[in-house]
Amino acid sequence: MEQARPIRRALLSVSDKTGILEFAKALNERGVALLSTGGTAKLLADAGLPVTEVSDYTGFPEMMDGRVKTLHPKVHGGILGRREQDDAIMAQHAISPIDMVVVNLYPFAATVAKPGCTLADAVENIDIGGPTMVRSAAKNHKDVAIVVKAADYDRVIREMDGNGNSLKLATRFDLAIAAFEHTAAYDGMIANYFGTMVPSYGDNKEGDEESRFPRTFNSQFIKKQDMRYGENSHQAAAFYAEEQAAPGSVASAIQLQGKALSYNNIADTDAALECVKEFDQPACVIVKHANPCGVAIGSDLLSAYERAWQTDPTSAFGGIIAFNRELDGATAKAIVERQFVEVIIAPTVSQAARDAVAAKQNVRLLECGQWTAPAQGFDFKRVNGGLLVQERDLGMVTLGDLTVVSKRQPTEAELNDLLFCWKVAKFVKSNAIVYAKDGQTIGVGAGQMSRVYSAKIAGIKAEDEGLTVAGSVMASDAFFPFRDGIDAAAAAGISCVIQPGGSMRDQEVIDAADEHGMCMLFTNMRHFRH
């Protein structure tokens, strides 16, 4: 039988006071004596709850503007004392056992995120007593419960009610894990912040920002699900998410129906969703093996889907489909009646769409919510023995960023298609070539070791599906090192090219475009994707 420990005395000291008053009232109603500090003690006292200030309990006042409050043997002895084994020494020094510690920490992350935050501001929001109590209680979880999340308050009360005001060892252990996760994340944030600073005391400075990248990199992710396997069936895998996953992301999406998401499902769905976010008009992106195989905009979602599917129906089989508008019934019905699909994701899903997809119970239907402007963050790539960290590729060009380098000027229709095509190319594996016309991909050449072969493949794809390349535009994710890619595009019927430029042979490539009567624009921005 599990060893349950009664809760008779609790120490409450929280920065985030969400739900703490209700929790304290519930503890008091169950006969738990309350110890507290500072603002938490005042909140409880003002609500009429019987609470003992830690300074009264220890006989030692808070000092140094609150820097020293709970760092006292009567506090930590009460938390760390092993029941039965340390009872005599605790009695000798008048140390009362503390059975539960309820603590969350100074808002360091919120403080350093504020505009104009100084190093001094950050330093004063480094919690010392809080993490010490959390770690003490977590270490002694055999006898003490540690609660660091407001989400656990109700759970604790329910178990106390069903267990004679006691908590089981399994619960205390689970709470201890959460506590160590909490302090690890907290210390990681502080280390990341300080790791970007170079102390330059003496020039009326307290620190200079040296780099976006700290000396050591600390980041915490929370396991969202275990998976049957990873990229391949012999690889174990799990999916982890940021604690505050961005709205409108795969990590924050809700699965409405279908089988459990696989490792490859999640990777491909992320690729599709991030691509479709680039478009303002109703858009559809179909992805296979992390590459867009069909992308289109339309007057509505149904027309966007029909045109995206038309690009490459063969590759669309078993693909991932993403939309940037609410999924409606007509579009959902067209998908499930036409093709086998692994995942459909949209910001919202209408009831009619849910009903239509329900006919295919294995289809994974996800609702990701509305997204906001993308926040700068980091992307990671694991290498053997190390980690590559870079800023997310949020770059995108507008018409004002483009430079016409050819003799021929693009038409307005070509300009619109060039921007559409460039948005797609950003999400195609390098070397990436995309053909497009009238807001629809015509052919996609992805992942080839030479750029000219990507161009040839895009043309072959279009021909195989009976699509007309003549009059289409082409986007290349990086510069053309030779003119051969332009010659191949011209032979296929491409009229206009958008590319970053920057090759030693740019003039040779521009001359090729002029020879073929094509127009060419430089973006001065590359979009490699590996």
Curated annotation (Swiss-Prot):
Protein name, entry field: Bifunctional purine biosynthesis protein PurH
GO MF annotation, one: phosphoribosylaminoimidazolecarboxamide formyltransferase activity
Organism annotation: Aeromonas hydrophila subsp. hydrophila (strain ATCC 7966 / DSM 30187 / BCRC 13018 / CCUG 14551 / JCM 1027 / KCTC 2358 / NCIMB 9240 / NCTC 8049)
Enzymatic reactions: (6R)-10-formyltetrahydrofolate + 5-amino-1-(5-phospho-beta-D-ribosyl)imidazole-4-carboxamide = 5-formamido-1-(5-phospho-D-ribosyl)imidazole-4-carboxamide + (6S)-5,6,7,8-tetrahydrofolate; IMP + H2O = 5-formamido-1-(5-phospho-D-ribosyl)imidazole-4-carboxamide
Pathway the protein contributes to: Purine metabolism; IMP biosynthesis via de novo pathway; 5-formamido-1-(5-phospho-D-ribosyl)imidazole-4-carboxamide from 5-amino-1-(5-phospho-D-ribosyl)imidazole-4-carboxamide (10-formyl THF route): step 1/1; Purine metabolism; IMP biosynthesis via de novo pathway; IMP from 5-formamido-1-(5-phospho-D-ribosyl)imidazole-4-carboxamide: step 1/1
Domain MGS-like positions: 1-148
Entry similarity comment: Belongs to the PurH family.
Keywords assigned: Hydrolase, Multifunctional enzyme, Purine biosynthesis, Transferase
HAMAP family: PurH
GO biological process, one term: 'de novo' IMP biosynthetic process
GO cellular component: cytosol
EC number: 2.1.2.3, 3.5.4.10
Superkingdom, natural source: Bacteria
Xref: SUPFAM superfamilies: Cytidine deaminase-like (SSF53927), Methylglyoxal synthase-like (SSF52335)
UniProt cross-references to SMART domains, sorted A to Z: AICARFT_IMPCHas (SM00798), MGS (SM00851)
Keyword Metal-binding among UniProt keywords: no
Domain notes: The IMP cyclohydrolase activity resides in the N-terminal region.
